[in-house]
């Protein structure tokens, strides 16, 4: 009798039990092999505890932790390089949104490998499948969000101008059928999503209709504090339009412009980062922007907007947020913008000091 059978005999005491135990073992292992990898991932409540522990670890070190809600993962940057940058910049957690090629599952895989660094985030809506309203893409997104495995959705593009790393000049109306799927999913599940929409005056109404029609959707409008074309973006020349929207729509949030202070948008030649006051004396947070951050401290978060092509900007982006934005507001406001607001959006819970 082999070791396996002798062991079972030893445990069971009777030969008749050997057969049954062998069948049970074979069945159990067979069942495990049939399960998807993430079926054995930790429960959501346990994952939240892991995230919380990491944030408290950074706090204990004397650094204000940051939760980065907008990272574009393309699979070309070695994950350990990203983690090193996160550590060097006090970024506790990253909402790791994959591109269409990798799919949402990739974020779960990386969370499984590094559960205290990466927040499971669905695919970004910035590729051909999204812009063609691909049914399979939308069905997969729906399945993913409803699975309960993801804490956030990626960034979905509406109007998008060509940028420093791509030439996409596209417009998926915010009130299109594809966006209705995203808004509905957020309304049903409470899972937040990011929206890229150039703030042209004539394009604001399509967004406002959706914010009004889906009051339970959690919408993070990306890159506030930016104006790429003051001719078309007349309302967004100052923070007043932002203040008006925040008052009207309690389900609207913003992440902050990531552009280098003083840099010009290549499409128009205008300085786009209106969040900052730039002078010969240096760079500071604009006075009116400071007022709006302190008036609505619960409505702003930090997103790096880093992708493969902009990876070397990571340190500069985080340093700008820390030295200009977070140091430019009250301590309690800085804490909310840095991590507490993102924490509530992803966990559904207030941060406990």
Where are these regions (language model features)?
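Hydrophobic faces of well-ordered beta-strands that scaffold small-molecule active sites
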Residues: 67-71, 94-96, 118-123, 152-154, ...
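Active-site beta-loop-alpha junctions enriched in small/polar residues
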Residues: 72, 99-100, 123-127, 156-159, ...
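Mid-to-C-terminal alpha-helical segments outside catalytic/metal-binding sites
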Residues: 7, 21, 40-65, 80-84, ...
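Active-site gating/metal-coordination segments in enzymes
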Residues: 46, 52-59, 100-194
């Amino acid at each position: 009798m082999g070791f396996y059978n002798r062991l079972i005999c030893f445990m069971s005491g009777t030969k008749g039990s050997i057969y049954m135990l062998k069948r049970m073992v074979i069945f159990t292992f067979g069942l495990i092999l049939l399960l998807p990898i993430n079926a054995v991932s930790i429960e959501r409540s346990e994952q939240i505890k892991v995230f919380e522990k990491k944030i408290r670890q950074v706090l204990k070190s004397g650094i204000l932790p940051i939760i980065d809600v907008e990272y574009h993962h393309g699979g070309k940057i070695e994950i350990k390089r990203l983690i090193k940058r996160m550590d060097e910049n006090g970024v506790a957690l990253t909402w790791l949104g994959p591109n269409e090629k990798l799919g949402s599952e990739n974020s779960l895989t990386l969370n499984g490998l590094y559960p205290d660094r990466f927040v499971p985030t669905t695919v970004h809506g910035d590729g051909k499948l999204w812009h063609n309203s691909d049914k399979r893409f939308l069905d997969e997104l729906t399945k993913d969000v409803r699975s309960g495995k993801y804490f956030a959705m990626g960034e979905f593009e509406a109007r998008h101008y060509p940028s420093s790393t791509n030439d996409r000049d596209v417009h998926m109306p915010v009130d299109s059928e594809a966006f209705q799927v995203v808004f509905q999913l957020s309304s049903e599940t409470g899972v937040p999503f990011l929206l890229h929409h150039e703030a042209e005056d004539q394009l604001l109404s399509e967004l406002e209709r959706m914010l009004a029609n889906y009051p339970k959707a959690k919408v993070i409008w990306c890159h506030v504090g930016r104006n790429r074309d003051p001719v078309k973006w007349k309302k967004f020349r100052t923070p007043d339009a932002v203040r008006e929207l925040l008052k009207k729509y309690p389900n609207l949030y913003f992440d902050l412009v990531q552009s280098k202070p003083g840099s010009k948008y290549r499409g128009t030649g205008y300085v786009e980062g209106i969040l900052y006051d730039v002078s010969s004396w240096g760079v500071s947070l604009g006075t009116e922007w400071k007022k709006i951050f302190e008036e609505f401290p619960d409505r702003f978060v930090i997103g790096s907007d880093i992708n493969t092509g902009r990876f070397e900007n990571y340190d500069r982006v985080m340093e700008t947020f820390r030295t200009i934005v977070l140091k430019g507001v009250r301590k309690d406001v800085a804490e909310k913008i840095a991590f507490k607001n993102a924490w509530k959006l992803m966990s559904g819970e207030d941060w406990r000091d």
